[in-house]
Amino acid sequence: MVQNNKLIILQPARDDIFDIANYHQSISGSSSALAIAREIKNALSLLKEFPLMGTVHDDSLLAKQGYRKFRINNSYACTYKVIENTVYVYTVTYNNKQKTGILN
């Protein structure tokens, strides 16, 4: 069943998206930066309708606290949590950096 939840991309995740876009701009130009930012935001918007499409976070401490991990594409993933009818996105990171710490 499709749900219609609220999606809140928290400031640390917004900063991550900005940093990712800046990185893409530095190596491939503005169109690449816009494309990756759009791809990430479009993927995150899927969580509004399908909040459990990500997996339980692979870090046991984060999993116990209800955090989930959603693979955006082959390079990036987000850490998020569903509280009632709201999806909170905490971080967007390079897949290999997704470790315990400050939710990244």
For each feature predicted by the language model, list its residue ranges.
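A short, surface-exposed loop/turn module that caps and links secondary-structure elements
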Residues: 45-71
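Enriched for short, Lys/Arg-rich terminal
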Residues: 72-77, 81-104
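Short, solvent-exposed coil/turn segments
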Residues: 2, 63-65, 73, 82
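A short linear boundary/processing microfeature
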Residues: 23-26, 53, 95
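Residue-level signal for well-ordered alpha-helical scaffold segments within enzymatic catalytic domains
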Residues: 19-22, 46, 81, 91
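Arg/Lys-rich, positively charged N-terminal/basic patches that mediate binding to nucleic acids
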Residues: 1-39
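Substrate-binding strand-loop-helix patch
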Residues: 42
